[in-house]
């Protein structure tokens, strides 16, 4: 698989043509250009130099591809509870862009309480009934005593704050 950087306008155009969660960028482009598998092999691709993954932030397009891979994985499918899927997606979002996640986590809150924090005690100050849990592989905690629809809204708002397109954020949040 090759990594291609596209500008925001082109990305949004491609993302708008996503038909289902889990659809790869290659599938979308093949459909848009009416390419078959055979024609794809005829396209010559200029090799790019190897880039150290740790030194490059994931582009928006590649971040969506990674999310699609997670959503179509056996691991995600095996998660039977909303909270387990919610936590897996939050953990993945942090892995994709920890700085954007941090900014989003600090800005998202309800009328009377915070949803995310770097401290369990901070969330407990807003009410002992919030049942904070640590998001796996992150320094963040999230309240978990909310209903499924609130979790979907929290996830969607997190993704929008991280600059994911609204359509993608909505589709991902509906999977939990």
Swiss-Prot record:
InterPro entries: Arc_rbn_hlx_hlx (IPR013321), Ribbon_hlx_hlx (IPR010985), SeqA (IPR005621), SeqA_DNA-bd_C (IPR026577), SeqA_DNA-bd_C_sf (IPR036835), SeqA_N (IPR033761). Homodimer. Polymerizes to form helical filaments. It comes from Hamiltonella defensa subsp. Acyrthosiphon pisum (strain 5AT). HAMAP family: SeqA. It is found in: Cytoplasm. Disulfide bonds: none annotated. Belongs to the SeqA family. This is Negative modulator of initiation of replication. One of its GO terms (cellular component) is cytoplasm. Keywords: Cytoplasm, DNA replication inhibitor, DNA-binding. Gene3D superfamilies: Met repressor-like, Replication modulator SeqA, C-terminal DNA-binding domain. Negative regulator of replication initiation, which contributes to regulation of DNA replication and ensures that replication initiation occurs exactly once per chromosome per cell cycle. Binds to pairs of hemimethylated GATC sequences in the oriC region, thus preventing assembly of replication proteins and re-initiation at newly replicated origins. Repression is relieved when the region becomes fully methylated. Its main location: cytoplasm. GO terms for biological process: negative regulation of DNA-templated DNA replication initiation; regulation of DNA-templated transcription. GO terms for molecular function: sequence-specific DNA binding.
